[in-house]
Regions:
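Short Gly/Thr/Asp-enriched flexible loops that form oxyanion-binding sites at enzyme active sites
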Residues: 62-73
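Short glycine-/acidic-enriched loop or helix-start segments at secondary-structure transitions
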Residues: 15-16, 65-67, 89-90, 139, ...
Length: 305
């Protein structure tokens, strides 16, 4: 098979294979390969070349960038997880497999259909593959100060980075505020005051924050997770368990649907790993309206057989 490899050389720690190392493994598996660094200005032009597989070596950021450019095309995306959280890879069951095992398994891998969300708001219209949210997680990420970012940058171990972000989240749970949100999800009125809202296409958000364990990225539905002020203790306990490497879920209510409308005031929004407004930009307007829909099975991903 002909493989186009999009490689993020900055992803993960120092022990990750180089792009050339991965190409060598692809050749050993009997495939041809074209290597493209995601750091090149026009890296995405490589996606226009004929290929049987688009392989992505990196984290959720570059996986999302590639996926959004492959919407509606029938070429499967094969993830080689090398990032910090690897939320999409974890949902697909490929995170803990070795890079060579994944590559040698491509010929027998399952082709998994994958939905794409679409978020319309003051920013225009943006597709997403992980989710959209506001509240606790988004506020924490938008308020990371220079000291926090320096601390994370100096951690070469991905597990240490995850733990550090989980600790930052936990430290903000007790002081977080609830926000009034007018929410319509299909024909249901879910309006109320919430500390967290996440409309999810996969199981995880941010630092492997597993909010929607039943999420199926190919069912044509979003999993909407909302948490009230009274549910802070559940979230705090879940984060503590994750920091201690215990398997647990926060047990928040999950609603399923495919058309979400949110009206709120002055909140920062994350769409996958992008923030709106961007850090340093003017504060969001007093009132915003967000419409979220789903395009069912717009992508194909490879998963273990």
């Amino acid at each position: 098979m002909k493989v186009t490899l999009i490689h993020n050389p900055d992803a993960g720690g120092d022990n990750q294979p180089s792009g050339d190392d991965i190409v060598e493994l692809i050749h050993k598996a009997g495939h041809s390969a074209t290597l493209q660094s995601s750091k090149d200005v026009e890296w995405d032009k490589a996606l226009e070349e004929p290929a049987d597989i688009i392989a992505v070596a990196g984290g959720d950021g570059i996986v999302g960038q590639v996926a959004k450019r492959m919407i509606g095309k029938q070429i499967p995306i094969a993830i080689l997880p090398m990032g910090t959280a690897n939320n999409v890879a974890t949902t697909l069951g490929v995170k803990h497999l070795a890079i060579d095992e994944l590559i040698f398994g491509w010929t027998s891998a399952r082709r998994v259909k994958f939905d794409v969300g679409n978020a319309k708001g003051p920013w225009g219209s943006i597709p997403f593959i992980e989710g959209l949210g506001m509240g606790l997680f988004t506020d924490t990420m938008s308020r990371l100060d220079a000291k926090d970012n320096i601390q994370l940058a100096h951690l070469s171990d991905t597990d240490e980075k995850l733990i550090s972000v989980l600790q930052m989240l936990r430290s903000r749970v007790e002081s977080c505020h609830s926000h009034e949100m007018n929410i319509t999800f299909d024909d249901r009125d879910l309006s109320g005051k919430y500390i967290l809202l996440e409309a999810m296409n996969i199981h995880y958000v941010g630092p492997n924050f597993c909010l929607a364990p039943p999420a199926d990225p190919g069912d044509g539905l979003l999993d909407l997770v909302i948490a009230s002020y009274d549910e802070r203790e559940q979230i705090h306990q879940y984060l503590s368990d994750r920091i201690d490497n215990k398997s647990n879920y926060p047990g928040l209510m999950i609603h399923k649907g495919n058309h979400l409308r949110i009206e709120c005031e002055g909140l920062t929004v994350h769409i996958d790993d992008d923030l709106w407004p961007e850090i340093g930009a003017p504060s969001p307007p007093n009132s915003i309206v967000i419409e979220v829909t789903v395009t069912s099975q717009a992508l194909e991903m490879l998963a273990p057989a």
